[in-house]
Amino acid sequence: IAYTYSRSFRTVPGISHDEEYRSPYDRPHCISIVVNYEFSDRFNASANWIYNTGQPITYPYGKFTDHGSTYAIYNGYRNQSRYPDYHRLDLSATWKGKKHKRWQGEWNVSIYNVYGRHNTWAVMFTPGENNTLETKHMYLFSVIPSISYNFKY
């Protein structure tokens, strides 16, 4: 089990009204829990759960259109909001084959992001109806299963 509490702020002249603001690396809470269990000499399983506070982001508060192009309007304060918190569970199981004179093999079955959490990778803002901006969250991965065979000689 690992836990980290960490804050990261920046002050840059001309940004955020010259006031301190959250840096992109400000993720106060990071938790990692890893469990490994060896059922026998030939079979083991593991679980890994990760949680991080969402990354800071600056949301626009309006938009305007000029010559057919739409632009976002920001209030001047940087990183006042956050992405949704990030978390996922990964599972893995490994079966080792019997040792032969010259080599040994093992099968591994893994599942990344077991419960299919849609962790935000990026946020896009698109023009919506009634002169509004719509927020679209982009996700990289959902559940990813894998099977592999490894051998040593």
Specify the residue positions occupied by each region the protein language model found.
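Gram-negative outer-membrane beta-barrel transporters
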Residues: 1-56
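Outer-membrane beta-barrel transmembrane strand signature
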Residues: 9, 92-94
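Extracellular loop and loop/strand-boundary signature of outer-membrane beta-barrel proteins
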Residues: 16-22, 76-80, 132-137
